UniProtKB/Swiss-Prot annotation:
Organism the protein comes from: Colwellia psychrerythraea (strain 34H / ATCC BAA-681)
An annotated GO BP: chorismate biosynthetic process
Protein name: 3-phosphoshikimate 1-carboxyvinyltransferase
Subunit-level organization: Monomer.
Alphabetized NCBIfam families for the sequence: aroA
Catalytic reaction(s) noted: 3-phosphoshikimate + phosphoenolpyruvate = 5-O-(1-carboxyvinyl)-3-phosphoshikimate + phosphate
Highest taxon of source: Bacteria
Length: 426
């Protein structure tokens, strides 16, 4: 097993230009593929999850050209749903941002499809999405375990209807239905059962749909009305914002050991909810300065917070390791959906935080972290989860080194993360 030991970092200072957002990159690729016309996507994220989407689109007959560096992609739209001449099996790794939207899009396409992935993907629920698609008369069969991939889809023309969808596990299920609904023949009303998690990710979906000329009526996130017979219209250029979740590690590092750190690619104008990670740092004591497309943090002594972080579920993981440098006990609440991500992140974070000496309480949907007087050197297991690896790199901001097992798992969203961290480390 490969390991990376990070020696103690004395100070953090500098500027970071963020890679493109994973959430926006895969949404943009799929919508551009369904659109009328040719779209040029810039600042596309170069990562495993994006490669899985690109490979799937190629198998589905979508033509695109990718720049040598991988950050620009020109997509020739299909002008609607896909049409596969022969049965296809699409391997999507552990990319939820590919699995869920493609499941919906292929249910409304012509052809037979199997969607599968790596072992962890087969543990990530998809049942609520399949149940919702069944209300549109989709034909989807579980091939191994009920409610989980792999699935077999017999695609056909779907008609709009009133759909009830459980919003309590993942916002990606709603995103998937929203993205296909405008292309159906009749109108669709989507009603949310329970509390909708991760609302900012729905805002991302609605924003990109609007950019591609499709409208949705949002009734306070309790229901959505989508007119049928709409079509996505290609954009000459769509620039993917920097990844706000990836920004969190550098912002936290600046808050802990700054110096001054500026991240470019997100700011006041960003559509991503994870930009509000900076607000949490400010509540903990950091000094934050906002511009339209950048955020600057200046390090100050940090104190613990007790907050509902359902609105920033990915970035909230970074607060769990930032808590190691704050005075008092930090509690992160309403984060049950950590359990259905790339790994059971609540359990993983609790386990690894204890290794470095923290006192941790792991609840069903919350975690409390009390830092030790001094951190212990530990080998951090990363569970093939990019965010666990990046979160625990912050331990090196102490007087203690940290060893990251399987550091290349960051390739899912940020292949050169450790190089970027070194650039701002003094």
């Amino acid at each position: 097993m490969e390991q990376l030991t990070l020696n103690p970092i004395g100070k953090i200072n500098g500027e970071i230009f963020l890679p493109g957002s994973k959430s926006l990159s895969n949404r943009a690729l799929l919508i551009a593929a369904l659109a009328n016309g040719v779209t040029k996507i810039t600042n596309l994220l170069v990562s495993d999850d994006i490669n899985h989407m690109l490979n799937a689109l190629k198998s589905l007959g979508i033509e695109y050209t990718l720049s040598d560096c991988g950050t620009e992609c020109t997509v020739i739209g299909n002008g609607g749903f896909f049409n596969a001449k022969k049965p296809l099996e699409l391997y999507l790794g552990n990319a939820g941002t590919a699995m869920r939207p493609l499941c919906a899009a292929l249910a409304a396409s012509e052809g037979e499809f199997i969607l599968t992935g790596e072992p962890r993907m087969k543990e990530r629920p998809i049942g609520h999405l399949v149940d919702a698609l069944a209300q549109l008369d989709a034909d989807i069969e579980y091939l191994e375990n009920k409610d989980y991939p792999p699935v077999k889809i017999k695609g056909k023309a779907l008609t709009g209807n009133t759909v009830t969808i459980d919003g309590s596990i993942s916002s990606q299920f709603l995103t998937a239905i929203l993205m296909i609904a405008p292309l159906l023949e009749t109108n669709t009303t989507i009603e949310i059962d329970g509390e909708l998690v991760s609302k900012p990710y729905i805002d991302i979906t609605l924003d990109i749909m609007r950019r591609f000329n499709v409208s949705v009526q949002n009734n306070d996130y309790k229901s959505f009305i989508v007119n049928g017979k709409q079509s996505y219209q290609a954009l000459d250029k769509y620039m993917v914002e920097g990844d706000a979740s990836s920004a969190s590690y550098f912002l936290a590092a600046g808050a802990i050991k700054g110096g001054e750190v500026t991240v470019h690619g997100i700011g006041k104008l960003s559509v991503q909810g994870d930009k509000h990670f900076a607000d949490v740092l400010e509540k903990m004591g950091a000094e934050i300065h906002w511009k339209d497309e950048s955020i600057t943090v200046i390090g100050k002594p940090l104190t613990a917070v007790d907050m509902d972080m359902n609105h920033i579920p990915d970035a909230a993981m970074t607060i769990a390791t930032t808590a190691l440098f704050a005075t008092g006990t930090t509690t992160i609440r309403n984060i049950y959906n950590w359990r259905v991500k790339e790994t059971d992140r609540l359990n993983a974070m609790a386990t690894e935080l204890r290794k470095v000496g923290a006192e941790v309480v792991e609840g069903k949907d919350y975690i409390s972290i009390t830092p030790p007087k001094s951190l212990k050197h530990a080998e951090i297991d990363t569970y093939n989860d990019h965010r666990v690896a990046m979160c625990f790199s912050l331990v090196a901001l102490s007087d203690t080194p940290v060893t990251i097992n399987d550091p290349k798992c960051t390739a899912k969203t940020f292949p050169d993360y450790f190089d970027k961290l070194a650039q701002v480390s003094c």
